[in-house]
Swiss-Prot record:
NCBIfam families linked: parB_part
Official protein name in the record: Probable chromosome-partitioning protein ParB
Protein purpose: Involved in chromosome partition. Localize to both poles of the predivisional cell following completion of DNA replication. Binds to the DNA origin of replication.
GO biological process: chromosome segregation; positive regulation of sporulation resulting in formation of a cellular spore
Gene transcribed to yield this protein: parB
GO cellular component term of the entry, any: chromosome
Species name: Chlamydia pneumoniae (Chlamydophila pneumoniae)
Molecular function in Gene Ontology: DNA binding
Key words, A-Z: Chromosome partition, DNA-binding
Length: 286
């Protein structure tokens, strides 16, 4: 193996002699990003070489293991390069290299939330780090680390939806507010099928929570909710015009509450008299 020296070395190696670290957290690479990087490399060259270490048997180098820069290495492969400049880290131990790979990618690469969560988990379980220590090493708040780790409580199906970009981190946080795994799966499906925004997903989640335990056959789309809200506003206005007081209608699941805003007991007496004189509300509203 190369003798330890104080500085790293930039060398040119065969592109096929490089292997990805088993601790590389990134699993998804955008083809669009790779094509943009290829265009940049063809225009100005590879500005920041990947970082590698030697994997040896005795004095013979078997291959070079990536510590950082897999995306650049992949782009060079796709561009048809046969060799690539790399920064060689000298005499770096297995544990140090693995930890460095995880931390380097967390800090520098735009990881998917699931990739980030899995990277944090490996730092904790493989290297025995606490959440506080992980947060310190990667330059993030402890609460951020904890929130990412919570994503791993989601089912593999929902994790895959997040990994593939079908839902966002915001959507995943909303799904986590549901304790029932079946409701989580249902909300995930609705978000994907209806292309819901996070705020719309929150409304559906509240409805699912309120109706938990009952038979739920159909969930409203955002258009349904908008139309329902408009109907409530129209009914509120008609009731207000009839009785002379401000009326507010609130719905929660299949239940609804009608509130009359009164100033004093005299208003209450007048409202009682009005209700008595108008018979059923359905007759008054028709």
């Amino acid at each position: 193996m190369t003798e330890e020296i104080s500085k790293d070395t930039i060398i040119e190696v065969a592109i096929d002699d490089i292997r990805v670290s088993p601790f590389q957290p990134r699993r998804v690479f955008s083809n669009e990003e790779l094509q943009e990087l290829i265009a940049s490399i063809k225009a100005v060259g590879l500005i920041h070489p990947p970082v590698v270490r030697e994997i040896c048997t005795g004095d013979r180098v078997l291959y070079y293991e990536l510590i950082a820069g897999e995306r650049r290495w992949r782009a060079m492969q796709l561009a048809g390069a046969t060799t690539i400049p790399v920064i060689l880290k000298h005499v770096i131990a297995d544990g140090t290299a693995a930890e460095a790979t995880l931390i380097e990618n967390i800090q520098r690469v735009n990881l998917n939330p699931i990739e980030m969560a899995e990277a944090f988990k490996r730092l904790i379980h493989v290297f025995g780090l606490t959440q506080d220590k992980v947060a310190y090493k990667v330059g993030k708040k402890r609460s951020t680390v904890a929130n990412y780790l919570r994503l791993l409580a989601l089912s593999k199906t929902i994790q895959e939806s997040l990994l593939q970009g079908q839902i966002t981190l915001g959507h995943a946080k909303v799904i986590l507010t549901l304790e029932d795994p079946i409701l989580r799966e249902k909300l995930n499906e609705i978000i994907i099928q209806e292309h819901l925004a996070v705020r719309e997903a929150e409304l559906i989640a509240k409805q699912l929570i309120s109706e938990e335990g009952s038979s739920i056959e159909l969930k409203p789309t955002p258009l349904d909710m908008a139309e329902s809200s408009k109907q409530h506003e129209e009914l509120q206005q008609r009731l207000s015009d009839l009785c002379g007081y401000k009326v507010q209608i609130k719905t929660r699941g299949s239940k609804a509450t009608v509130s009359f805003h009164l100033q004093n007991t005299q208003d209450l007496q007048k409202l009682e008299a009005w209700l008595s004189s108008h018979g059923t509300l359905s007759e008054s509203l028709s």
